[in-house]
Structure formats: structure tokens, C-alpha cells
């Protein structure tokens, strides 16, 4: 079985944790997680891809084992996350990479691939259930975005691991985790013990300040500038990537879209079918 290495590096003055899979001499795939999540969400996918690729799965600052910011109003935004991603690639001497981004991780990928200074850094861009903005109204009016805003700044507290796992089974029901072991792993890598002995999700509540940076949520200009090959994955019942936005994005000549039946925001990329779609696109 392929096992990851756990690494900590200082990038732009912040300590960033990431898991590293496979041979660094092979082509690199960066897997970047969603808003409150962490790099271990990609363990199943990374284990499969590591036969052919070098895989990096970072924890964004404020999540997982990466450092929490002392200046959250400034640091918790897509622009800074994009700069950290470029800084990590530079630090590791990686000129180009394939990119798999779930939700926020996809938005970061759009920013990088759609910025003239960096657009050659990403050759293949996979966006997992995230759009470039809204079609008509403000992004904040999208039902799934409103749902996320309602809870992200106040992570719940529980006494036991089981209670937290049951909570995750509720709010992440549409991810498509398929068995109890996957839920155990998902919860284990997403929790921390509190000073009072309780347990809670492992992220800085201040990451909710992201939503003060409303410009981060409108990425249409960057979207139009992307030259990379693009695969847009949409959960069939997603409330974060509306169908009309996905259809608009699919009109871009270098973008193809697939829909994952019965799943919402965001597919866990954990099944043979989903992994096969990704493997075929990355080739």
C-alpha cells in the first residue's frame, strides 16, 4: 500500500502542512480541499494516483495541521491562498502541475490558472463542484453558499468522537462517503481535542472572514483567461454549483463537464467511477 509522507514547510511566513504521495520525479498533481476541510480528504484519490503521479495535498492555513493566522482579516482570502499555493510549488521546485480542487480549492485553481503571471503553472484543472460565480444574482444568494455561511464561523463542540462523526454524517451527507471506515477516517482527520476535553472540527473559526472578501466569489474574468484543459465535476443535486452556472461554464471550448448522480456538494472523489473520470482526464 502506498503511504503518504507528512511534511511541514514555511511558505510566505506561514507554516503549511501537506501530505506527499508518490515519486517526486513524476508529474505533480496538487489536490486542494474545500473551505473547512483539509488535505486528507483526498487520501483515497491520492493513493490511486500515486502510482503514476507525485501528489501534494496541502492543508490551507487555518485548517488541519497548518498554522492559524494572527491576521485573519487579511490572510483568510483566496488571493493569499493562491499566493501560498504558488509559494509551495516554488519552494518544492515544481514548475507545472495538474490541479484537483474541491469547492474552495477549485476557486484557488481558477485564480492561479486565470492569472497571466501564473496561468502556465497549471496544465490540467479539475474543478469539483465549484463555479466561477453566479449567473444573475450575487454569489452570496446561492443556497449552498448561504448554508455554508450560516455555520462556518461557529464550529460545534461535542463531548465524543461519535457525536462529531454523526454531525458530519448530517452536514456532509451529500459527499457520498460509502462506508463506516470512510466516515471514521473523515472524522479522525477533521477533529481536535479542546482544552475542556471536548472535541470539535479542526479549523480556525475566523476562516469565516473569507466572506468579507466578496470579490473572491466572482471569478468570471479569471475563468475567461484560463488556457488549461478543464474538467468541471458537478454533484447532480448540488446547491453550491447551480446548473445554469455549470452550463455557462461548459460553453468555454476547453471545458468539459460531468455530473455525478445522486450526490451534492461536493463529491468525495472516492469511488472507482469518479477516480476513473479523473485518471482519464489527467493523462
Go through each PLM region and give its residues.
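Alpha/beta-hydrolase fold catalytic core
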Residues: 1-30, 51-53, 94-95, 123, ...
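Active-site loop/oxyanion-hole signature of alpha/beta-hydrolase fold enzymes
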Residues: 44, 57-100, 104
Amino acid at each position: 500500500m502506498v503511504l503518504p509522507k507528512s511534511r511541514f514547510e514555511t511558505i510566505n511566513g506561514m507554516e503549511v502542512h501537506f501530505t506527499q504521495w508518490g515519486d517526486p520525479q513524476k508529474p505533480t498533481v496538487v489536490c486542494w480541499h474545500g473551505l473547512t476541510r483539509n488535505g486528507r480528504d483526498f487520501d483515497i484519490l491520492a493513493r490511486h494516483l500515486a502510482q503514476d503521479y507525485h501528489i501534494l495535498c496541502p492543508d490551507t492555513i487555518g485548517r488541519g495541521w497548518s498554522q492559524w493566522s494572527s491576521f485573519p482579516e487579511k490572510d483568510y482570502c483566496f488571493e493569499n491562498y493562491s499566493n501560498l499555493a504558488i509559494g509551495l510549488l516554488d519552494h518544492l521546485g515544481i514548475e507545472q502541475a495538474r490541479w484537483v480542487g474541491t469547492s474552495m480549492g477549485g476557486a484557488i485553481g481558477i485564480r492561479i490558472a486565470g492569472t497571466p503571471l501564473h496561468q502556465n503553472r497549471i496544465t490540467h484543472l479539475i474543478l469539483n463542484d465549484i463555479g466561477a460565480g453566479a449567473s444573475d444574482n450575487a454569489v452570496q444568494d446561492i443556497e449552498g453558499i448561504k448554508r455554508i455561511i450560516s455555520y462556518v464561523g461557529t464550529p460545534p463542540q461535542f463531548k465524543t468522537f461519535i457525536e462529531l462523526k454523526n454531525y458530519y454524517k448530517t452536514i456532509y451527507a451529500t459527499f457520498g462517503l460509502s462506508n463506516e471506515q470512510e466516515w471514521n477516517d473523515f472524522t479522525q482527520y477533521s477533529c481536535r481535542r479542546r482544552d475542556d476535553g471536548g472535541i470539535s472540527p479542526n479549523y480556525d473559526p475566523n476562516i469565516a472572514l473569507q466572506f468579507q472578501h466578496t470579490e473572491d466569489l466572482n471569478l468570471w474574468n479569471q475563468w475567461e483567461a484560463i488556457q488549461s484543459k478543464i474538467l468541471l465535476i458537478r454533484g447532480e443535486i448540488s446547491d453550491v454549483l447551480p446548473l445554469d452556472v455549470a452550463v455557462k461554464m461548459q460553453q468555454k471550448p476547453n471545458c468539459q463537464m460531468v455530473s455525478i448522480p445522486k450526490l451534492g456538494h461536493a463529491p468525495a472523489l472516492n469511488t472507482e467511477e469518479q477516480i476513473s473520470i479523473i485518471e482519464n482526464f489527467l493523462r
